[in-house]
Amino acid sequence: FIKSLIRIQGIALILLIGIFSILFYLSGKELWIFDFMGHYIPNVFSEVTGGREQGFFLVQRLYIFLVGLSLCTLSVANMERLPNWNYCHRKMYVAGGIFGGLALLAVIGVFCSFHENIKTRSFYSACQEKYEKTPEVRVVSHDIELRRAGDSLYMKSHLVLVNEGKYPCSTFTFYLNPGLRVDSLWEGCQQVAFLREGQILSIDRRLCAGDSVSLQLEYSGKIDERICYLDVADDVYSSFKVFPGGLPYRFARCYAYVGDDFMLLTPESIWYPVTSPPVVTSRDVVMRGMYFTRYTLRVVGEKDRVVISQGKCLREKDSRLFDAGHALPALSVCMGNYERKYLKDAGTLYEIYCFKGHD
């Protein structure tokens, strides 16, 4: 295309070298739009979770293909032809313009998707900073019931909260993944009103110093990964992890996963309600002390999968109950097609779980 525009071969060659140098420099700088070789986009496929960010990968490669097709078509249109073939020139220009327009739409789609994620994370950070100075109450015990259907979660929580401060509080807050909708909130037989803003669940309920309250929550929905690690800079969050050893492979970041074959939920995704955020986003707020809670987790279903969580597992008819027997700072759960291998030595049980065929 450059050679068809600039008839002098030497100048065209120098210009091409300059363009390629600029493209190599800009690769990975801004949403990998200029990464024509695909070195800076996620290209690793997992047998467990599949290909993360597959949509972005396909759109980016489609954009590069359309740009190349547009330039090839326009270069043909610029070639000198016989006078009675002028109509062919117009067709090539139209085709090149269409391919270029489609490539532009693909770029706009990538930009909108990335900037929407950054905008959403900024909203979550603003919500947290707004409520970070609200007096905290401690969750003494928390009984969780989890049921999964596809990539959706249906959960129940029974919490006992205590105001361990010296002063009464008129309002306290919960943090819960914004992708999970609160279906009901009860205190005994009385329904409790609440205000939901992003990941914040604000409850107007007076709690005197030393008093406790028991609440029951029902919530459901899909996990929103954008709530994880709000203290991480946007450019780091949008980047992809490099494969160890300097190999040209990139991992897509995945902070939570819910599916039929695999599930991983960590405290950073706030998959159950807590009164203390996992990270602090404001410089004016000092990270508060770590609270320990007596957790129990009941996972309903998942008969054909191995479920892993903290505590001793008690199998029941259609569920599994995990109880550590002591207070924990947080709770995680993992489910998959695992094989369990264990060794008992001097009264101590050592366990390791690995995917079948990957040990």
How would you label these PLM feature ranges?
Residues 66-97:
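Cytosolic-side transmembrane helix boundary signature
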Residues 154-156:
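Short, solvent-exposed loop/turn segments enriched in Ser/Thr/Gly
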Residues 1-78:
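Hydrophobic alpha-helical segments
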Residues 218-330:
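Extended, low-hydrophobicity, Ser/Thr/Pro/Gly-biased non-transmembrane segments
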Residues 168-169, 177-238, 284:
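A surface-exposed beta-strand-loop module
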Residues 196, 201, 297, 338-359:
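Juxtacatalytic substrate-recognition/specificity segment
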Residues 34-39, 54, 87-152, 252-258, ...:
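N-terminal, polar/Ser/Thr-rich
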Residues 160-165:
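Asparagine-centered strand-capping/turn motif at beta-strand->loop junctions
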